[in-house]
């Protein structure tokens, strides 16, 4: 009888041991999955942060490039192309939150470009290079936090209303 009891105890112990090992493996796998999931979330968050920084840097570089190109076109008297470059620069300055250069470009648009162009020339920019002043105004309205851009938006709209409709009207006006 003591052998039977000993055998039974060993068998029970072995079963308990196997069951405990299985439970430990299950728990370890669960903890591994939780750690992997948590690490994936953190890595994904960091990747998104870096992607956003890269996108901001790209937007900043593009904005400055188009800003300079607009200045060159303005100096050469190609105001229609300068306006297109300034519109593109303004969109990129909005993306990278460079409000100082955005104000500069918007002032160039209102002071140097729109007064010298007809609405026909301004609308032709959509076809020429995809620069749409109306989309820029919409985007400025969306990003107009605390009313910082209200006066320049108003000024652009007023200048557009005063602009001659066609190239012929512009020539007659001068």
Write out the residue ranges for each language-model feature.
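Transmembrane signal-anchor/signal-peptide helices with a preference for the extracytoplasmic
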Residues: 2-27, 31
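Terminal, low-structured helical/coil segments at or just beyond the last alpha-helical repeat
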Residues: 128-174
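Short, flexible coil/linker elements and helix-boundary hinge sites characteristic
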Residues: 14, 97, 113, 144-145, ...
